[in-house]
UniProtKB/Swiss-Prot annotation:
Full protein name: 1-deoxy-D-xylulose-5-phosphate synthase
Cofactor detail note: Binds 1 Mg(2+) ion per subunit.
SMART domains: Transket_pyr
Record: residues binding Mg(2+): 151, 180
Amino acid sequence: MKKISDYSLLFKINSPEDLRKLAIEQVEQVCKELREYIIEVLSENPGHLGSNLGTVELTVALHYVFNTPYDRIVWDVGHQAYGHKILTERRESFHTLRKLGGISGFPNPQESEYDAFIAGHASNSISAALGMAIASWLKGENRKIVAIIGDGSITGGLAFEGLNNVSSNPNDLLIVLNDNNMAIDRSVGGLSQSLIKITTSYTYNTIRFKLYNFLKKYSIIKERERGFILRFTNSLKALLTKQHNIFEGLNIRYFGPIDGHNIKELVKVFEDIKSMKGPKLLHVCTVKGKGFGPAENKADVWHAPGKFNPETGERIKVWSENLPSLYQDVFGHTLVELARMNNNIVGVTPAMSSGCSMTFLMKEMPHRTFDVGIAEGHAITFAAGLAKEGMIPFCNVYSSFMQRAYDNIIHDAVLQNLNMILCLDRAGLVGEDGVTHHGVLDLAYLRCIPNITITAPLNEKDLRNLMFTAIQPNAKGVFVIRYPKGYGELKNWEYSFEALPVGKGRKLKEGKEIAVVSIGTIGNLARKAIRLVEKLGISVAHYDMIYLKPIDEELLHEIGKNYRCVVVIEDGTIKGGLGTAVIEFMVQNGYDPKIKQIGVPDEFIPHGTIAELYKLCGMDIKSIVKCLIEEK
């Protein structure tokens, strides 16, 4: 553990205003201390390490040059903004990162005025920043707006929509492309470096601006010809450097690439271009995990490594060999098995192949596995195209990210009754990633769609069997399987496949007084709670629906006829999910049991451990037991 004296400059910075008082030589030391502080805190309190080590100098330079919070910094995704949080009045609370009641792991305007726009999902920064920049222009403000987007996020469709619109409106937006994967070709040679110095210089841009105004004043060019002039100058630059890029084709002035870890160069370039008129993009090259050897060498492993020894780089294992398998690994291994059985099966995922374990199929059958990048809507429509031609796509998307592809599901898949499987990983409350990542809306927003099958397994065996069921001839149309992140319930799950009848649930336990109706893995908590209340003499039946749609009406008739009290338990929002379906059925069929709903309340849930959030929402075992006792 480092002492306060080890952070002689960083711990004196309580806001960017303090940072801006320092000499540039001192700012280099701030970068060193900031990187060390991030490593120290994250070694004990896990979070996103690699991306934050890579943006230290960029973050410091932005706050050193721009007048935040008056000037706006809009982060894309936002998991790389820890340094930003530390410099913006949250250093002392940084140890509470991602903890219940602590600061978020992503920018959140409700947390700080320095967080200009919410982040968590990818590719929204350019559109948001453009709107803010135009608002600033309309109000006659001199506010600078900066969007920070990575080379992964910029592949998203929303980013391209924003880029396409940037030059259509008057604005001085600055886009910083944080390239940490060398996804875009590098400029080479001395001419390119000289051109960067020239095109960012005050003299060049003053002459450029005055020349344009002169031509316009004397009607030599008209406003509508401005784009032609800009394209001409961009073409000239491309001719000189033997390079051209999409940004200049969209009439966005392009600068770079520059070293994203050279703080002096970053500060100089930001100072030179911040007052330039018109939209511009600065291409900054960074190294993910910069300054921490293990993270630089294995960027994928150290993206979010958990606890580790900051001195040795050894990751600290917190799991036991005796734990069940991860649901993600069950999905991955089962998909490989099914693909061996059926040559038409393919895998599709939007940039989450490792997280969802589709890498298993990718390793064995790379020609039948498609990682389409950060493009959820494209992933669904691409899978629909595969299905249209007779393939059987398993499209795996995190539940919260599937929200971005809602229209694609309806228009491109369901309306055509295409046979495809949507696997919603990270369903339910996900824990420390918080409000932008909880997958609690899926049951509700999918249930209202006609001609769709929606399922949720109780355990790993069910997940395996539902994947098998989804490829059977009687499983027509879009087949949804939702399951949570993390460990399952069973140590042995690799049984022979068994198709689960579509639209049929099951009665897990007999009971006389109360009927518990559940769907998904939260049913395991319900089983434990029921065993506890049985010891108190309360007789509780338990029904696992398996299918939300089509729902098992035979089971619901049985429940309506035989129980005066029904407790519905689900790990999704209580508005529109299983509970709503049960209430609708009972009303429509003339049953009048008392119905109690346990699930995610009608509000956005913060970050914290899953256990803490279940307790917060009244979904933990203790809360379920209390409810059953009260309803006796």
